[in-house]
Amino acid sequence: MDDKFDDDALPNSKTTAKDYEDKLPEYDYTTTFPNTWMRLREPFREYFAEFVGVAVLIIFGVGADCQVVLSANTGVASSPKGSYLSLNCGWAIGTAMGVWISGGISGGHINPAVTLAMATWRGFPWWKVPGFIFAQLLGGIVGAGLVYVNYIHAIDIVEGGRHIRTLDTAGLFATYAADYMTNLSCFFSEFLATAVLIIVIHAMNDKRNTPPPAGIVPFVLFFLILGIGASLGMETGYAINPARDLGPRMLTAMVGYGRQVFAFRNQYWIWCPVLAPFLGAQVGTIFYDLFFYKGQDNVFGRLGSHIHISPA
């Protein structure tokens, strides 16, 4: 591309600012790197987008958890600063903003269960899966760390000191099921909520269904997460995202909560907020593909398609 201006591009008494800007050379940033930094960052943009997307999700979501719960203590605030509705709004807004930031770059998975489902059933490259999941998990750790630093003094007041850390405040960062829940019911709750999540995601991405207009997806996800929280969130805290739970859980283990965050209910952390969402996303995708999806990448649509019966 020739980056020199011709005579007509030079400003004169009859040239307006807009005319001059219109004649400036245009660079195709999708194929041309104007500097070394642009070239070096290109292979990592998708992973960094997932990292930031999850970090933003956690900042809004865990931040809302902390504000609602910690402000209920009179030593922290004179009156409560929120409710269960505002808590759900925090997670819904966090999801919407996280997808808005990362959607045009990485696809806006911000959830390992979604990434694995897309790789299994929608042709997402398998070689990207480990990097995506690592970036998502790291985003969960960093996002939770930022919220922890922001609310550390309020946590100290609620706990009774800087070096006292119990599951009461650990629950602000990761999910811990209600005492009355059985192990099976905990697993089913996360499985069901994640299946609903992925079914709606596939419906939004299905061009033969009713996909939302460009740029509207984050708003749809806002109402989706708000609805899941309002209907299925009370019993387990609706992790529905392994990075959302495991990242902050690892952060709490590192800042003083110790092994108790992993020992809760016989390693609850792995089979409920991690394995259940992975399985729920897979089964939810199978359900959508079996009964609704007509895309060429539908595995069930290809079964037996090579068989042709000729008339006698």
From Swiss-Prot:
InterPro entries given in the database record: Aquaporin-like, MIP, MIP/Aquaporin, MIP_CS
Glycosylation sites: N183
Chain ranges for the short sequence motif NPA 1 as given in the UniProt record: 111-113
Function: Water channel required to facilitate the transport of water across membranes. Does not mediate the transport carbon dioxide nor nitric oxide across the membrane. Plays a key role in root water transport of mycorrhizal plant such ectomycorrhizal white spruce or trembling aspen via the hydration at the hyphal-root interphase. Contributes in fungal cellular processes during the basidiocarp formation.
KW Transport (keyword) present: yes
Gene: AQP6
Residue interval(s) of motif NPA 2: 241-243
Ranges that cross the membrane: 51-71, 90-110, 129-149, 184-204, 214-234, 268-288
Pfam name, any one: MIP
Keywords from the named record: Glycoprotein, Membrane, Repeat, Transmembrane, Transmembrane helix, Transport
Name recorded for this polypeptide: Aquaporin-6
Annotated domain remarks: Aquaporins contain two tandem repeats each containing three membrane-spanning domains and a pore-forming loop with the signature motif Asn-Pro-Ala (NPA).
Subcellular compartments: Membrane
Record-linked NCBIfam families: MIP
GO CC entries: plasma membrane
Source species: Laccaria bicolor (Bicoloured deceiver)
Induction description: Expression is high in vegetative mycelia and highly up-regulated during development of the basidiocarp. Expression is positively correlated with root abscisic acid (ABA) content during ectomycorrhizal interaction with poplar trees.
Gene Ontology MF terms: glycerol channel activity; water channel activity
Regions of this protein lying in the Extracellular compartment: 72-89, 150-183, 235-267
Family assignment from sequence similarity: Belongs to the MIP/aquaporin (TC 1.A.8) family.
Domain of life: Eukaryota
Membrane topology, as annotated: Multi-pass membrane protein
Catalytic activity: H2O(in) = H2O(out)
Main location, first listed in the record: membrane
PROSITE patterns, sorted: MIP
Topological domains annotated Cytoplasmic: 1-50, 111-128, 205-213, 289-312
